[in-house]
Amino acid sequence: MSVHINAAEGQIAETVLLPGDPLRAKYIADTFLEDVVLYNEVRGMYGFTGTYKGKKVSVQGTGMGVPSMSIYANELVQSYGAKNLIRVGTAGGITPDVKVRDVVIAMSASHDMAQNRVRFNGLDYAPTASFDLLHKAYMTAKEHGIDAKVGQIFTTDQFYQDDFHHFKKWADFGCLAIEMEAAGLYTLAAKHKVNALTILTISDHLLTGEETTAEERQTTFNDMMKVALETAIQL
């Protein structure tokens, strides 16, 4: 048991999917997993363990942003022995190369994250995915006919921005999308010597203004889940 996760020893798998939305965690468990057990509902942040094609997999909601995600990632690794952390979530597209509902696999994450500014005394750290997970996810997408885009993304602390135009600079340097957790996850995984990957669905596009509905963001991103779960059973 940890401060924010009320699971018994052995209830959490070594591979954990990390959606930000706890209701998406429930949807994933109900839709894709078998023999599901609810191991956590502290603060309404649901955690489930089940099986996918016979492989034990957990799914844990994390909340939004690096500070909230970091609490759950730390406790999963330090208290429950998680070895593979796969974030599944949404992002905003910032380049014409990605469209709404595309799957993006985040190779690395530039950021404006305050935590790393403090952690590295103002120096720049390059949060990067685990290559083994990245390679498995990319090959899995290809095998299932899913046109996943692989590249750099941008992690921001601010959901509401005064000016979105500054993200054009990041797009000019190859960033595909914006989200709020990946850089923190990759940093923590490096610190604790575990594997981490972020797989995203583009839910809206800052260039075109196109967006998905709240219901779609919760329930319909099945290509992303196919890639994540088929990757998970290889670990």
Curated annotation (Swiss-Prot):
Q: Which positions does the site annotation Important for catalytic activity cover?
A: R217
Assigned keywords, A-Z:
Glycosyltransferase, Transferase
Active-site residues annotated for this sequence: D204
Which residues make up the binding site for a purine D-ribonucleoside?
H4, E179, M180, E181, S203, D204
The UniProt entry, under SUPFAM superfamilies, shows: Purine and uridine phosphorylases
Gene3D superfamilies membership: Nucleoside phosphorylase domain
Domain of life assignment: Bacteria
List the Gene Ontology MF annotations in alphabetical order. Answer: purine-nucleoside phosphorylase activity
- Coiled-coil regions listed in the entry: none
Question: Where does the chain bind phosphate?
Answer: G20, R24, R43, R87, V88, G89, T90
Query: Looking at the UniProt record for this protein, which Gene Ontology cellular component terms does it annotate, in alphabetical order?
Result: cytosol
What's the catalysed reaction? a purine D-ribonucleoside + phosphate = a purine nucleobase + alpha-D-ribose 1-phosphate; a purine 2'-deoxy-D-ribonucleoside + phosphate = a purine nucleobase + 2-deoxy-alpha-D-ribose 1-phosphate
What InterPro entries does UniProt report for this protein, alphabetically?
DeoD-type (IPR004402), Nucleoside_phosphorylase_CS (IPR018016), Nucleoside_phosphorylase_d (IPR000845), Nucleoside_phosphorylase_sf (IPR035994)
One of its GO biological process terms is: purine nucleoside catabolic process
Q: What is its EC number?
A: 2.4.2.1
The subunit structure is: Homohexamer; trimer of homodimers.
Q: Which NCBIfam families match?
A: deoD (TIGR00107), PRK05819.1 (NF004489)
Function, in words: Catalyzes the reversible phosphorolytic breakdown of the N-glycosidic bond in the beta-(deoxy)ribonucleoside molecules, with the formation of the corresponding free purine bases and pentose-1-phosphate.
Q: In which family does this protein belong, per the annotation?
A: Belongs to the PNP/UDP phosphorylase family.
Query: What is the protein named?
Result: Purine nucleoside phosphorylase DeoD-type
State the organism of origin.
Exiguobacterium sibiricum (strain DSM 17290 / CCUG 55495 / CIP 109462 / JCM 13490 / 255-15)
| Chain's gene name | deoD
